[in-house]
Amino acid sequence: MTKDDDQEFKIIRELKENAKVVWSDFSLFENFTGTAAPKVVKFAGINANDRVLDVGCGTGVLALTAARLGAKVVGQDLTPTLVERATENSRIFGLEVDFVESDVEQLPFENASFDCVISQFGHMFAPRPSVALSEMLRVLKPKGTIAFATWPPELFMGRFLKINGKYGPPLPKSAESPVLWGDVKVV
């Protein structure tokens, strides 16, 4: 490993630690992210007893929507506060969903352990989309379904993220823009 590699990993680690703080107050985003959940679940074709992983689950809106159909759902998020809120929401709604704190770039699940991997915006903030996608596909069963909601680059949030990337803290060389997930040519 070179000195540049060490620096790159250090920056990525710092990005993830900062993300835990930034996303711990998700209340600003809840109002305009929840409406996508039923659409993602329907698009994914989730059925009762499917094993489903919600990547970057936030407060659990998407995971709970899938659980209402009888799916066996695990919600994953990097931010401890969000995992706690998702767990509390699961209890309030009387739904059984396992929520775990983990990194999408190193998912703590066996290969081919989910029928469906879903995400509602959370996945797109992994600093290295190719690593995140590789992990999502690793835990997906053969012929499984992957479905997610993301903001396209040309709409408000995509433009906001582009400006933030330009003037925000420096990103590691391997980091890619979150809006790439919304570009059909890339995905």
Where are these regions (language model features)?
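Conserved class I S-adenosyl-L-methionine
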Residues: 2-50, 61-65, 82-85, 89-93, ...
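Short conserved AdoMet
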Residues: 45-47, 68, 127, 141
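Class I SAM-dependent methyltransferase SAM/SAH-binding core
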Residues: 51-55, 59-106, 131
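A short acidic, Gly/Pro-enriched loop at the edge of an enzyme's catalytic core
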Residues: 105-116
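A short SAM/SAH-binding and catalytic strip from SAM-dependent methyltransferases
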Residues: 116-129
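Conserved catalytic/acceptor-binding region of the Class I
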Residues: 130-131, 137, 141-187
